[in-house]
């Protein structure tokens, strides 16, 4: 839920949001996110994380272009502020 709205998340979006929520306030690198959400045997591009972050922002941010919940930490990764 986001306020009174029920969010419709895809399974991987849910896993990503859950993982980030469990590490609120911590900077998480793409590699760490990939390992914990997609698994150590994931074959693909780390930009997969960026795409899923963008999809989540579109669903949970009031203004996805100026996010307040999922923050990009330039050169490091992402931080979830809740």
Residue ranges and their predicted role:
Residues 1-14, 41, 79-82:
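A structural micro-motif at secondary-structure boundaries
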Residues 8, 53-82:
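DNA-binding patch around the recognition helix
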Residues 13-16, 30:
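The N-cap/first-turn positions of alpha helices
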Residues 17-18, 34, 54:
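Hydrophobic residues on short alpha-helical segments
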Residues 31, 47, 54:
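Residues within helix-turn-helix
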């Amino acid at each position: 839920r986001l306020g009174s709205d029920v969010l419709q998340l895809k399974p991987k979006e849910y896993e990503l949001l859950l993982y980030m929520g469990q590490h609120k306030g911590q900077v998480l690198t793409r590699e760490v996110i990939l390992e914990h959400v997609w698994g150590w045997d994931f074959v693909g591009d780390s930009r997969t994380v960026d795409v899923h972050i963008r999809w989540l922002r579109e669903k949970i941010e009031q203004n996805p272009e100026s996010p307040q919940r999922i923050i990009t930490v330039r050169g490091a990764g992402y931080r979830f502020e809740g």
